[in-house]
């Protein structure tokens, strides 16, 4: 089945994501960092484009996302917004830019003015007051729980989260807290597939998985990972969609179709 953008395809909005969840239609998200790739992903039916602080890894060659600044995100958001017509544009708030609700608001205003339609922040229960502060000021929020890369040093490395009863209970508490604070989307990274399914059923808002199994409302991958460009370690949850394709358009279309059809992620891409 083709999911190529048609002229009558409506622009994706925060409210239409909720409608997709209610209808059982899986949400497709990819990272994007420039206008050309944004346009390519958009015309192939990607629902959400994420200007991720992963640009530190794949664009700048950094070992972590921590060196990424707000100015970097603003610049890449401006670039991506120029190539986007239908997809919803979400931008990360980078490390150190949302330590207080007031700081988060000023950071979010910068990226919204650059073209973002939603901001993504990493954190759970502790972040709820900040999310509430932003939502009350008309800033849509996507929360990111589980493995949060900005906390890599606190975690002692990039490790699967939510294993064990206590950790699973904490992740559920995080999910409910960000939802209750007003988040309209939740990314869950590197958690057991069964737990991700429980959280997805527990919430009334869409969940987006990356290394979180098939039961999430949608999936996200870093563009470079999806295209088989691995500058370092290849995560377990990554599939190279360039395999069997001759063009990047073909690879993106294959990714969109695999997410929509529920053939990605497979068991080999998930954690127990």
From Swiss-Prot:
Pathway: Cofactor biosynthesis; (R)-pantothenate biosynthesis; (R)-pantoate from 3-methyl-2-oxobutanoate: step 1/2
CDD domains found in the cross-reference section: KPHMT-like
EC number per UniProt: 2.1.2.11
A GO molecular-function descriptor: magnesium ion binding
Annotated binding of 3-methyl-2-oxobutanoate, by residue: 53-54, 92, 120
Keywords: Cytoplasm, Magnesium, Metal-binding, Pantothenate biosynthesis, Transferase
GO cellular component: cytoplasm
A Gene Ontology BP annotation from the UniProt entry: pantothenate biosynthetic process
Cofactor remark from the record: Binds 1 Mg(2+) ion per subunit.
Recorded catalytic activity of this chain's protein: 3-methyl-2-oxobutanoate + (6R)-5,10-methylene-5,6,7,8-tetrahydrofolate + H2O = 2-dehydropantoate + (6S)-5,6,7,8-tetrahydrofolate
Active site (record annotation): 189
NCBIfam families listed in its UniProt record: panB, PRK00311.1
HAMAP family membership: PanB (MF_00156)
Assembly behavior: Homodecamer; pentamer of dimers.
Protein name: 3-methyl-2-oxobutanoate hydroxymethyltransferase
Species name: Ralstonia pickettii (strain 12J)
């Amino acid at each position: 089945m083709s999911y190529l953008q048609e002229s009558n395809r409506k622009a994706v909005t925060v409210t239409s994501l909720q409608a997709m969840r209610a209808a059982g239609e899986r949400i497709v998200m990819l990272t994007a960092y420039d206008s050309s790739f944004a346009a390519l992903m958009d015309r192939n039916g990607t629902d959400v484009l994420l200007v991720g602080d992963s640009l530190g890894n794949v664009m700048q060659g950094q070992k972590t996302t921590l060196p990424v600044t707000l100015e970097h995100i603003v610049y890449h958001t401006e670039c991506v917004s120029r190539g986007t017509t239908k997809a919803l544009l979400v931008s990360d708030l980078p490390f150190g830019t949302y330590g207080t609700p007031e700081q988060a608001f000023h950071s979010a205003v910068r990226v919204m003015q650059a073209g973002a339609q939603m901001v993504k922040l990493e954190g759970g229960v502790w972040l709820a007051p900040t999310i509430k502060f932003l939502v009350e000021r008309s800033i849509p929020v996507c929360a990111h729980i589980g493995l949060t890369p900005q906390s890599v040093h606190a975690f002692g490395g990039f490790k699967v989260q939510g294993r064990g009863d206590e950790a699973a209970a904490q992740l559920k508490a995080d999910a409910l807290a960000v939802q209750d604070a007003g988040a309209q989307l939740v990314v869950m990274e590197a958690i057991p597939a069964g737990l991700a399914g429980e959280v997805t059923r527990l919430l009334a808002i869409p969940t987006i998985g990356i290394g979180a199994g098939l039961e999430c409302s949608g999936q996200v991958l870093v563009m470079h990972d999806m295209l088989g460009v691995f500058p370092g370690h290849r995560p377990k949850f990554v599939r190279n969609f360039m395999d069997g394709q001759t063009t990047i358009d073909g690879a993106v279309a294959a990714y969109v179709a695999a997410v929509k059809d529920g053939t990605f992620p497979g068991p080999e891409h998930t954690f127990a």
